């Protein structure tokens, strides 16, 4: 799995994805989320893999254990590099996800979403009825994730240092909410720059609109890549 900034391909069609990818002449690490996968499906996965790119298939599975296990069996056949579930689904569901994935793929990494980077502490308490700090909630979910046998979590860069200290540096910490200095915050709440994310212990960063909506996506990508890789 490449140690590159993961580009969130938040497009609604395969045509727009291919137009975007045609601008690059190097292997990338890209994220395909629900919006795109539900429109374009497995055929797009195969097309992107044929270009030599790594893929994070970001579907955030969250259902009863049996359903997630069977769904993950299907994802295991797609030869993607990274998949995920919601940690809120519980330990049994996460263990089932690992079983399903490993039935067809031992190479694909699997991680769990702790708290979305759009979540604030006020939302955590008033809407999710979780009466702890975000850091405590994320650490609890991440600990359960590690105990269930997953490879890491999706978390804010702001929690990455805590998770490294508690769960070790080999536990993946994939961090959205990355914005270069001066970029628009959009709907993210808990954000940092690429440089700060690395210093805080993130193992991978996810960047979308600052690259995909840039006037010069290739230049923006390389700027972020240089900031991330140092």
UniProtKB/Swiss-Prot annotation:
Gene3D superfamilies given in the database record: Aldolase class I
Active site, UniProt feature: 60
Reactions accelerated catalytically: orotidine 5'-phosphate + H(+) = UMP + CO2
Biological process (GO), any one: 'de novo' pyrimidine nucleobase biosynthetic process
Keyword Lyase: yes
Keywords attached to this entry: Decarboxylase, Lyase, Pyrimidine biosynthesis
Disulfide bonds: none
Protein EC: 4.1.1.23
One GO cellular component, as annotated: cytosol
Keyword Disulfide bond included in the entry's annotation: no
Quaternary structure and partners: Homodimer.
Listed name of the protein: Orotidine 5'-phosphate decarboxylase
Taxonomy of the source species: Bacteria, Bacillati, Bacillota, Bacilli, Bacillales
């Amino acid at each position: 799995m490449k140690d590159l900034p993961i580009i969130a391909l938040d497009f609604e069609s395969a045509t727009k994805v291919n137009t975007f990818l045609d601008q690059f002449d190097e292997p990338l690490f890209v994220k395909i989320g629900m919006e795109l996968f539900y429109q374009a499906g497995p055929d797009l996965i195969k097309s992107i893999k044929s270009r030599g790119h790594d893929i994070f298939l970001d579907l955030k599975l969250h259902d009863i254990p049996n359903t997630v296990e069977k769904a993950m069996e299907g994802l295991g056949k797609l030869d993607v590099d990274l998949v995920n579930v919601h940690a809120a689904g519980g330990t049994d569901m996460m263990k089932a996800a690992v079983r399903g994935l490993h039935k067809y793929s031992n190479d694909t990494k699997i991680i769990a979403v702790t708290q979305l980077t759009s979540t604030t502490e006020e939302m955590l308490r008033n809407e999710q009825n979780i009466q702890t700090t975000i850091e405590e909630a994320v650490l609890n979910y991440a600990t359960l994730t590690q105990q269930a046998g997953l490879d890491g979590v999706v978390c804010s860069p702001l929690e990455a240092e805590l998770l490294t200290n508690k769960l070790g540096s080999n536990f993946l910490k994939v961090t959205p909410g990355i914005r270069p200095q001066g970029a628009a915050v959009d709907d993210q709440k808990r954000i940092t720059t690429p440089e700060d994310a690395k210093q805080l212990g993130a193992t991978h960063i996810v960047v979308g609109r600052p690259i995909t909506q840039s006037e010069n996506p290739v230049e923006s990508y390389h700027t972020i890549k240089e900031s991330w890789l140092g």
